[in-house]
């Protein structure tokens, strides 16, 4: 079948019913969040994927926007039969807090003054962005996200979700990012901010009814854009080629193609982005640090989701070494984490360019479901000195066919099934007097939380079993997985 587009889309807006309390302690009134959705939320509301955009992105991640006809910034990856398959998943992307594409930010109207906030807008953090996103997810009635996916600043948002709302996510793909902004990254952001604030048209951030500080914003974008490229990609794209001339001009006009390219990037950016938003979002990047309250592994101590960390070998803004630090911290916390390094000459921007590699990584990761994702955690157990009658009563009241037999420490000793109960009755024994220990199966086939679903399905078929206890490394029962669980998962 041919991969397709989600078609024409429009941006929706959700207005928070209450004030938003920020990390700084300040509050925002009348907060709006702009978002788009693709695909359908299923009946159980367990097929939602939340996608996060990078610094200059917006909620329009896929499809063709009804207002301007523009294609979504990740349209190559989101859509029917694409790696983020909208035939299977309900995909959500929102504009971040502090942005300038529909979500409340410095260009929004301050309800207290009826004028744009400007720099009266409170300084925000990545954590504040995530808090607003959680409000949106709650509004949509989603209790648990199938996955979260983001690159660069979007990767920071994904990490913040892992640390703040670990119980809400099943998995995460975290791309080309860091767990804390480095001095070098902060330095580039500060240079960009100074370029904007040094532009006379910035006027203390009060330029909304005049002209935007376009020269300062363009310069900030030029500086930032260099960090998204690599030495090799710039050499391949531009070399030392001149722009529309054969000889040097011997003046301070544009000579080289790379100069013309950066000027174009800067000028075009001013037509779609707000200068004050650039100040606020880069400041949020600077403040991002998951290690500030202790070790990085401590930030993930409650995380049980499976994780994919992706880096780019030529990325010098958020290096592979920084990605590996995240992998190490998660591994220390016992998290099921995988790592993939994209091979590309395109630097930081490769996650938006290398569509083939990104599609493979994401599709393989999303389709690789493990026991932990679907097992039943609310299950019944029984002791070996209890009776078959007790087991029969449990099976009827709970509508189950398999009950793990455990010790006082919850260690697996055996399993009792509906077949065992039926056998006792058929043999005309008094089930009131028969102990579980007399009828239970002691050699139990089990599953572990990180087993692949495909492996468990094969095991069930091989042994003609419809339900398995899930145990940890100490043999303690932590869940149950049934053929029905697996069937329901395959249909997502």
From Swiss-Prot:
The keyword Phosphoprotein does not apply. Residues 47-352 form the AB hydrolase-1 domain. SUPFAM superfamilies: alpha/beta-Hydrolases, CBS-domain pair. It is found in: Cytoplasm. The keyword Cytoplasm applies. It catalyses: L-homoserine + acetyl-CoA = O-acetyl-L-homoserine + CoA. Substrate binds at residues 221, 349. CDD domains: CBS_pair_arch_MET2_assoc. Its main location: cytoplasm. Belongs to the AB hydrolase superfamily. MetX family. This is Homoserine O-acetyltransferase. The gene is metXA.
């Amino acid at each position: 079948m041919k991969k397709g587009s989600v078609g024409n889309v429009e941006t929706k807006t959700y207005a928070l019913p209450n004030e938003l309390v920020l990390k700084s302690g300040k509050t925002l009134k009348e907060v709006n969040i702009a978002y788009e959705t693709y695909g359908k939320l299923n009946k159980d509301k367990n097929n939602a994927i939340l996608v996060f955009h990078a610094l200059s992105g917006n909620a329009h991640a896929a499809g063709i926007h009804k207002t301007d006809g523009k294609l979504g910034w990740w349209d190559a990856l989101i859509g029917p039969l694409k790696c983020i398959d909208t035939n299977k998943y309900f995909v959500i992307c929102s504009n971040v807090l502090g942005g300038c594409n529909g979500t409340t930010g410095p260009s929004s109207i301050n309800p207290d003054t009826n004028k744009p906030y400007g720099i009266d807008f409170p300084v925000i953090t990545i954590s504040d962005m995530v808090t607003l996103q959680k409000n949106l997810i709650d509004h949509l009635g989603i209790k648990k996200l199938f996955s979260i996916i983001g690159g660069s600043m979007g990767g920071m948002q994904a990490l913040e979700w892992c640390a703040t709302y670990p119980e809400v996510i099943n998995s995460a793909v975290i791309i080309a990012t860091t767990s804390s902004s480095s001095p070098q990254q902060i330095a580039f952001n500060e240079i960009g901010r100074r370029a904007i604030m040094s532009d006379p048209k910035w006027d203390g951030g009060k330029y909304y009814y005049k002209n935007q500080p376009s020269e300062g914003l363009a310069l900030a974008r030029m500086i930032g854009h260099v960090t998204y490229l690599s030495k090799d990609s710039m050499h391949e794209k531009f070399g030392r080629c001149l722009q529309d001339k054969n000889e040097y001009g011997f003046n301070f006009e544009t000579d080289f193609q790379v100069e013309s390219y950066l000027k174009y990037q800067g000028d075009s950016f001013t037509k779609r982005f707000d200068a004050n938003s650039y100040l606020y979002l880069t400041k949020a990047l600077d403040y991002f640090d998951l290690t500030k309250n202790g070790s990085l592994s401590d930030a993930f101590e409650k995380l049980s989701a499976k994780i994919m960390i992706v880096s780019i070998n030529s990325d010098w803004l958020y290096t592979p070494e920084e990605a590996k630090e995240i992998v190490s911290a998660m591994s220390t916390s016992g998290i099921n984490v995988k790592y993939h390094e994209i091979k590309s000459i395109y630097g930081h921007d490769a996650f938006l360019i290398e569509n083939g590699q990104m599609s493979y990584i994401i599709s393989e990761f999303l389709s690789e479901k493990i026991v932990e994702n679907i097992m039943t955690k609310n299950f019944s157990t029984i002791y070996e000195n209890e009776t078959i009658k007790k087991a029969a009563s449990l099976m009827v009241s709970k509508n189950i066919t398999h009950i793990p037999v455990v010790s006082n420490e919850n260690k697996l000793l055996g399993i009792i099934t509906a077949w065992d109960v039926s056998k006792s009755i058929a043999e005309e024994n008094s089930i009131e007097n028969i102990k579980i220990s007399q009828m239970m199966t002691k050699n139990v086939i089990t599953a572990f939380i990180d087993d692949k679903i495909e492996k468990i399905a094969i095991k069930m078929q091989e042994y003609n079993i419809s339900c398995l206890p899930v145990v940890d490394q100490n043999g303690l029962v932590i869940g149950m997985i049934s053929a029905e669980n697996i069937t329901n998962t395959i249909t997502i």
